[in-house]
Amino acid sequence: NALLPNWLWLPVGYHGRSSSIITSEVPVVRPKGQTKVEGENPKFEASARIDFELEMGFYTFDGKPLGERISTAEAEDFIFGLSLFNDWSARDIQQWEYVPLGPFLAKNFASSISPWIITLDALQPFAVDTPVQEPAVLPYLKFEGKKSYDINLEVFIQPKDGAEDRVCLSNFKYMYWNMAQQLAHHTVNGCNIRCGDLMGSGTISGPTPDSYGSMLELAWKGTKPLTLSDGSQRRFIQDYDTVIMKGHCTNGNIRIGFGEVRSQLLPAQD
């Protein structure tokens, strides 16, 4: 679908929850919820469209008191570091429930993070320019300097007892809105942040089809299935598939790895 009118004007987001954030190697159970096919009544059933979303998560220090905002110029002073982040989604549940208040059961069943947090200080050699933003952003979202980061990202799908197949090769530098802008927008109304708060970047998709950061895009909403090395096809993630995300930065003789976040999808419970 075309971007909504607000997408080029503000970093669209929503508040989540911490209770179902899990680390690498913790399996994810296929969720159930309401789905609806056009012309039919809603059904309560297991989601048939489980998707990964390739993201980075950034972690904050304690922020300012409630009622005070953080500017883009000072935002990185409040960011401790980053990890890999798989923001699981149930697309069919999401499609029915998200209007008008946004996703709920489609997102809160699990979010997976890698075990390593790389500090923002360590990432400074990999700072790059943010993509050109048109139209010009509002004053509180303007910034100076290099606020994006060159982080190479990969996603693999591994069927049960099968090989890992890379399905996505992307980069954090493709993000339209940088972290400083995201944090400035998050706090512009006076919302406070606390030490250890986790902010998801949003899906990281690049300019080419192999850099799209979700199955929704890679398989084009199921109309262009991916073929794995064993000959099987994927429109979305199947039971017992393992989704693996990896990330690293490299610059001459310097290489910093983010490790990986590895999560297997298990069948829905009765």
Language-model-detected regions and their locations in the chain:
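Exposed beta-sheet edge/beta-hairpin loop segments within beta-rich domains
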Residues: 45-49, 190-191, 234
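Acidic, glycine-rich active-site loops and adjacent beta-strand->loop/helix elements
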Residues: 27, 88, 205, 249-250
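Acidic, low-complexity intrinsically disordered regions
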Residues: 170-171, 265
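Active-site pocket scaffolds in enzymes
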Residues: 177-185, 192-195, 199-248, 254-266
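Hydrophobic alpha-helical scaffolding
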Residues: 103, 172, 230-233
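Active-site microenvironments in enzyme catalytic cores
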Residues: 1-169, 177-181
